[in-house]
Swiss-Prot record:
Methylates ribosomal protein L11. InterPro entries: Ribosomal_L11_MeTrfase_PrmA, Ribosomal_PrmA_MeTrfase, SAM-dependent_MTases_sf. Belongs to the methyltransferase superfamily. PrmA family. The keyword Transferase applies. SUPFAM superfamilies: S-adenosyl-L-methionine-dependent methyltransferases. Its main location: cytoplasm. CDD domains: AdoMet_MTases. The keyword Methyltransferase applies. This is Ribosomal protein L11 methyltransferase. It catalyses: L-lysyl-[protein] + 3 S-adenosyl-L-methionine = N(6),N(6),N(6)-trimethyl-L-lysyl-[protein] + 3 S-adenosyl-L-homocysteine + 3 H(+). It is found in: Cytoplasm. Keywords: Cytoplasm, Methyltransferase, S-adenosyl-L-methionine, Transferase. Its EC number is 2.1.1.-. It comes from Cupriavidus pinatubonensis (strain JMP 134 / LMG 1197).
Length: 297
C-alpha cells in the first residue's frame, strides 16, 4: 500500500483549524511543524504537561497530512480550504510514501552517537562501538534527550571534561535522565534528577536501571531544597530566566552551574538574569546553541 504525504505552509492562527479539517477529510495522521526548523529563525515552544500551551503553533507552521491510497489529497485540501473559508486554495506539496517495515525503518534512523572523547549513546538494538567507552544505552521514547540535540551534547561534553569524582549533581529538567546518568557513569556522587513531567521521571528511572546506575528522580515538590556541587539545566531560555533565583540557590558556595537550551542570541540576557547570584559565561557553542557555565562565589 502506498501513502501520500501532503505539506501545506499556513499561518500560526490557522494551523489547528487545518489539522482538524484534514482529519475530518480522512487524513490518517496530521502533524504541525516549525517551517523554520533547523534555521536561525527556529522558534522553540514550551509548556508544562497538563496545562494549555501559551502558543499552539509556530509563526510559520507546516501542516503535514498523510493520506491512504483511497483518498485524493488534492480533493481533501480543496475541501478543507472551502470549509475554512480560505480562497484561493493555498499551495501544497505532495510526496509518495511507500509502505514498509516502519519499526525497522525507525530503528535504522537511530545509530550510536559519539559525544566528546569517550561517551557513546547506544540504542538497545546496537552494540557498543568501543569496549572501553562510557556507554549509555538509551532508546528514543517519551521524554526528551537522546544525545542527538546540540544542547544535550554540549552538557555531556562539559561533564566529561569538568566533572570531578564524587561531586554531587542536580539535573533540573531531567527529561530522559541522560545527563544524570552520564554524570554517574563519569564518577559523580549523589545525583538527583528533577522534572515537572511524571512521564519523564518514570522514563529516567527506567533508563537509570537499564544503565545500572544509582540515581534518584523525582517531581520538584517531593524533594528538599538541598545544595549541590553541580547543577545542570538543559531547558529553554525563558524558563531558565524565570528560575534564575531558584537554580542559583541550589548551587553550593564554590559549586558550578551549567545551563543549555539557549540560543547564541539569547546568551547575554540569560547571563544577565543570573548575574545577581553568579557570573555566567559561554563555555562552548554548537549549531547556534550555547552552553553557559559559572561558579557561585
Amino acid at each position: 500500500m502506498a501513502f501520500q504525504e501532503c505539506v501545506i505552509e499556513v499561518a500560526q492562527d490557522q494551523a489547528e483549524a487545518w489539522s482538524d479539517a484534514l482529519f475530518d477529510l480522512c487524513a490518517l495522521s496530521v502533524s504541525v511543524e516549525d517551517a523554520d526548523a533547523d534555521t536561525p529563525d527556529e522558534q522553540p515552544l514550551f509548556g508544562e504537561p497538563g496545562l494549555e500551551p501559551t502558543k499552539l503553533a509556530w509563526n510559520r507552521s507546516r501542516v503535514v497530512a498523510l493520506f491512504g491510497d483511497d483518498t485524493d489529497p488534492a480533493l481533501a485540501v480543496a475541501a478543507a480550504s472551502n470549509a475554512l473559508g480560505i480562497d484561493p486554495v493555498p499551495a501544497y506539496a505532495l510526496r509518495e510514501v511507500e509502505d514498509q517495515d516502519w519499526v525497522r525503518l525507525t530503528q535504522s534512523q537511530f545509530e550510536p552517537i559519539r559525544i566528546g572523547e569517550r561517551i557513546w549513546v547506544v540504542p538497545s538494538w546496537h552494540d557498543a562501538p568501543e569496549p572501553d567507552a562510557v556507554v549509555l544505552e538509551l532508546d528514543p521514547g517519551l521524554a526528551f534527550g537522546t544525545g542527538s540535540h546540540p544542547t544535550t551534547r554540549l552538557c555531556m561534553q562539559w561533564l566529561e571534561q569538568n566533572l570531578k569524582a564524587g561531586e554531587t549533581v542536580l539535573d533540573y529538567g531531567c527529561g530522559s535522565g541522560i545527563l544524570a546518568i552520564v554524570a554517574k557513569k563519569l564518577g559523580a556522587g549523589d545525583t538527583l534528577g528533577i522534572d515537572i513531567d511524571p512521564n519523564a521521571v518514570e522514563a529516567s528511572r527506567y533508563n537509570a536501571e537499564r544503565n545500572q546506575v544509582q540515581a534518584d528522580f523525582a517531581l520538584p515538590e517531593s524533594v528538599s531544597e538541598a545544595t549541590y556541587d553541580l547543577v545542570v539545566a538543559n531547558i529553554l531560555s525563558n524558563p531558565l530566566k524565570l528560575m534564575a533565583a531558584m537554580l542559583s540557590a541550589r548551587v553550593r558556595a564554590g559549586g558550578r552551574l551549567i545551563l543549555s537550551g539557549v540560543l547564541e542570541r539569547q546568551a547575554e540576557e540569560v547571563a544577565a538574569a543570573y548575574a545577581p547570584w553568579l557570573p555566567l559565561t559561554v563555555w562552548r557553542s554548537e549549531e547556534g546553541w550555547v552552553c553557559l557555565h559559572g561558579t557561585r562565589p
